[in-house]
Regions:
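C-terminal output helix
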Residues: 114-124
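CheY-like receiver
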Residues: 123-124, 128-138
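Receiver (REC) domain active-site loop signature in two-component systems and cognate sites
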Residues: 61
Length: 138
Protein backbone atom coordinates (compact mmCIF):
# COMPACT_ATOMS: atom_id res chain seq x y z
CA UNK A 1 0.00 0.00 0.00
CA UNK A 2 1.17 3.54 -0.71
CA UNK A 3 2.73 4.95 2.43
CA UNK A 4 1.70 8.57 1.98
CA UNK A 5 -0.25 10.34 4.70
CA UNK A 6 -4.02 10.36 4.88
CA UNK A 7 -5.24 13.89 5.55
CA UNK A 8 -8.39 14.00 7.70
CA UNK A 9 -10.07 17.40 8.02
CA UNK A 10 -12.85 17.33 10.59
CA UNK A 11 -13.73 19.45 13.60
CA UNK A 12 -15.56 16.59 15.34
CA UNK A 13 -12.99 15.10 17.70
CA UNK A 14 -14.99 11.90 18.23
CA UNK A 15 -15.30 11.27 14.49
CA UNK A 16 -11.55 11.79 14.12
CA UNK A 17 -10.82 9.29 16.89
CA UNK A 18 -13.17 6.73 15.31
CA UNK A 19 -11.47 7.18 11.93
CA UNK A 20 -7.99 6.74 13.44
CA UNK A 21 -9.11 3.71 15.47
CA UNK A 22 -10.68 2.12 12.39
CA UNK A 23 -7.46 2.63 10.41
CA UNK A 24 -5.45 1.03 13.22
CA UNK A 25 -7.82 -1.94 13.50
CA UNK A 26 -7.65 -2.41 9.72
CA UNK A 27 -3.83 -2.30 9.89
CA UNK A 28 -3.74 0.66 7.50
CA UNK A 29 -0.05 1.61 7.62
CA UNK A 30 -0.56 5.24 6.59
CA UNK A 31 -0.18 7.99 9.15
CA UNK A 32 -3.44 9.90 9.59
CA UNK A 33 -2.78 13.62 9.90
CA UNK A 34 -5.78 15.40 11.46
CA UNK A 35 -6.74 19.04 11.05
CA UNK A 36 -9.71 20.52 12.91
CA UNK A 37 -9.67 23.70 10.80
CA UNK A 38 -9.66 24.02 7.02
CA UNK A 39 -7.23 26.96 7.06
CA UNK A 40 -4.60 24.91 8.90
CA UNK A 41 -5.08 22.05 6.44
CA UNK A 42 -4.75 24.39 3.45
CA UNK A 43 -1.56 25.92 4.88
CA UNK A 44 -0.14 22.42 5.39
CA UNK A 45 -1.02 21.40 1.84
CA UNK A 46 0.84 24.45 0.52
CA UNK A 47 3.95 23.57 2.54
CA UNK A 48 4.04 19.79 2.09
CA UNK A 49 6.80 18.13 0.12
CA UNK A 50 5.20 14.71 -0.38
CA UNK A 51 1.90 13.85 -2.00
CA UNK A 52 -0.85 12.80 0.45
CA UNK A 53 -2.52 9.45 -0.16
CA UNK A 54 -5.90 11.20 -0.08
CA UNK A 55 -7.82 13.93 1.71
CA UNK A 56 -11.08 13.16 3.49
CA UNK A 57 -12.90 16.26 4.67
CA UNK A 58 -16.08 17.06 6.55
CA UNK A 59 -18.32 19.49 4.70
CA UNK A 60 -19.54 21.36 7.77
CA UNK A 61 -16.48 23.08 9.19
CA UNK A 62 -16.13 26.35 11.13
CA UNK A 63 -14.85 29.49 9.36
CA UNK A 64 -13.97 27.83 6.02
CA UNK A 65 -16.31 24.96 5.18
CA UNK A 66 -15.26 21.93 3.19
CA UNK A 67 -16.74 23.23 -0.06
CA UNK A 68 -14.79 26.48 0.22
CA UNK A 69 -11.60 24.56 1.04
CA UNK A 70 -12.03 22.41 -2.06
CA UNK A 71 -12.61 25.54 -4.14
CA UNK A 72 -9.39 27.08 -2.77
CA UNK A 73 -7.44 23.93 -3.67
CA UNK A 74 -8.89 23.96 -7.18
CA UNK A 75 -7.95 27.61 -7.64
CA UNK A 76 -4.37 27.16 -6.41
CA UNK A 77 -1.83 26.75 -9.22
CA UNK A 78 0.46 24.60 -7.06
CA UNK A 79 -2.16 22.27 -5.57
CA UNK A 80 -4.58 21.76 -8.48
CA UNK A 81 -2.05 19.98 -10.77
CA UNK A 82 -1.14 17.56 -7.98
CA UNK A 83 -4.62 16.00 -8.32
CA UNK A 84 -4.75 14.97 -4.66
CA UNK A 85 -7.76 12.67 -4.22
CA UNK A 86 -10.36 14.67 -2.31
CA UNK A 87 -13.33 13.02 -0.62
CA UNK A 88 -16.09 14.40 1.54
CA UNK A 89 -17.70 12.69 4.49
CA UNK A 90 -20.54 14.38 6.26
CA UNK A 91 -23.39 13.69 8.65
CA UNK A 92 -25.83 14.90 6.00
CA UNK A 93 -25.98 14.67 2.25
CA UNK A 94 -28.86 16.38 0.53
CA UNK A 95 -28.99 16.10 -3.24
CA UNK A 96 -28.19 19.80 -3.53
CA UNK A 97 -25.11 19.50 -1.30
CA UNK A 98 -23.83 16.46 -3.16
CA UNK A 99 -24.31 18.25 -6.49
CA UNK A 100 -22.37 21.29 -5.19
CA UNK A 101 -19.58 19.01 -3.98
CA UNK A 102 -19.22 17.15 -7.27
CA UNK A 103 -19.25 20.45 -9.17
CA UNK A 104 -15.92 21.05 -7.39
CA UNK A 105 -14.40 17.88 -8.90
CA UNK A 106 -14.30 15.75 -5.78
CA UNK A 107 -13.66 12.02 -6.02
CA UNK A 108 -16.28 10.82 -3.53
CA UNK A 109 -18.98 11.80 -1.06
CA UNK A 110 -19.79 9.58 1.92
CA UNK A 111 -22.33 9.91 4.71
CA UNK A 112 -20.57 9.35 8.03
CA UNK A 113 -21.60 5.90 9.23
CA UNK A 114 -23.03 5.47 12.70
CA UNK A 115 -21.10 2.24 13.29
CA UNK A 116 -17.44 1.27 13.39
CA UNK A 117 -18.23 -1.41 10.81
CA UNK A 118 -19.52 1.26 8.43
CA UNK A 119 -16.47 3.46 8.95
CA UNK A 120 -14.19 0.49 8.27
CA UNK A 121 -16.08 -0.34 5.07
CA UNK A 122 -15.55 3.18 3.74
CA UNK A 123 -11.87 3.24 4.72
CA UNK A 124 -11.29 -0.17 3.15
CA UNK A 125 -12.98 0.79 -0.12
CA UNK A 126 -11.21 4.14 -0.37
CA UNK A 127 -7.74 2.86 0.50
CA UNK A 128 -7.98 -0.10 -1.87
CA UNK A 129 -9.18 2.10 -4.72
CA UNK A 130 -6.58 4.84 -4.32
CA UNK A 131 -3.80 2.34 -3.72
CA UNK A 132 -4.39 1.04 -7.26
CA UNK A 133 -4.70 4.50 -8.84
CA UNK A 134 -1.81 6.52 -10.23
CA UNK A 135 -1.33 10.25 -9.64
CA UNK A 136 0.70 12.96 -11.35
CA UNK A 137 4.26 13.06 -10.06
CA UNK A 138 5.13 16.51 -8.73
Amino acid sequence: MKSNRIILIDDDEEDCELFITACAELNIPNEVLVFNESKKAFDYLLSMTTQPFFIICDVNMPVIDGLELRKKINENNELRPRAIPFLFWSTSGSGNLINKAYALNIQGFFIKPSTMKGIKEIITAVTLYWDCSYHPIR
